[in-house]
Regions:
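Hydrophobic residues within alpha-helical transmembrane segments
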Residues: 4, 26-33, 58, 62, ...
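Hydrophobic alpha-helical transmembrane segments of multi-pass membrane transport proteins
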Residues: 11-12, 38, 58-73, 99-148, ...
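Hydrophobic/aromatic residues within transmembrane alpha-helices
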Residues: 15-17, 21, 77, 86, ...
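Short helix-capping/hinge motifs at transmembrane helix termini and TM-loop junctions
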Residues: 17-18, 39-44, 104-109, 168-169, ...
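Hydrophobic transmembrane alpha-helices of multi-pass small-molecule transport proteins
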Residues: 21-43, 98, 154, 163, ...
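Cytoplasmic-side transmembrane-helix entry/capping segments in multi-pass membrane proteins
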Residues: 21-33, 81-89, 145
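Juxtamembrane helix-loop-helix junctions in multi-pass membrane proteins
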Residues: 69-93
Length: 194
């Protein structure tokens, strides 16, 4: 589903007249989507053909649409807000929704075990995905625009596969190489100057 973010950003960007799309970007997009499909399906076309969808996929589609719209609107940001101010707003809104859920879970006896591992994971999540990743994403959109930035999302399945190989000792297979080649070629092509 993440592979749908770059095309959605390109569509929103075109509709809002934020960025023009060129043939290199469209070609790179197709190559990278093919690469993502190769990795997530283990190069087995039957896995793609037999995909089925459920309620969770609808929520994921809503997430894809919101992230794409957010990313496109970042370029159009005419507010005098810094990247850290935007992050602070997002954290505040997130807390408004998550604190009641946390309190509810506490009230029904679902206790969080606060130990060293929990604290280390929390610190990691706060620093890297919550602050550093958002800051870098906002900066990338500011510098190269939403269309070109969005192509780098296609690296997520590649990095997930690499982490599985390193951490879980999964075997590096031909489909990893083929998928990586298409993803990297697509990103390179879509970021070429016309």
């Amino acid at each position: 589903m993440l592979a749908a973010i770059p095309p959605m950003i390109i569509i929103f960007s075109s509709i809002m007249k934020i960025e023009n799309t060129n043939l290199f970007q469209l070609s790179g997009l197709l190559l990278s989507i093919f690469g993502v499909g190769t990795i997530i399906s283990n190069a087995d076309i039957q896995k793609i053909i037999s995909l089925s969808f459920n309620k969770g996929d609808i929520w994921m589609l809503i997430c894809v649409l919101s992230w794409s719209l957010y990313s496109t609107l970042l370029k159009k940001n005419k507010f005098a807000l810094s990247q850290f101010s935007l992050i602070q707003i997002m954290v505040t809104v997130g807390l408004i929704f998550l604190v009641p859920q946390f309190l509810y879970e506490q009230s029904i006896g679902l206790d969080v075990k606060i130990n060293k591992a929990f604290i280390l994971i929390l610190i990691y999540v706060v620093i890297f995905p919550a602050i550093a990743a958002y800051y870098c994403w906002q900066k990338a959109i500011e510098l190269i625009g939403p269309n070109r930035s969005s192509m780098f999302i296609q690296l997520m399945p590649l990095f997930s596969a690499l982490m599985a190989i390193i951490i879980f000792k999964e075997k590096f297979q031909t489909f990893h190489f083929i998928g990586a080649t298409f993803i990297i070629s697509g990103i390179y092509l879509s970021n070429r100057k016309t």
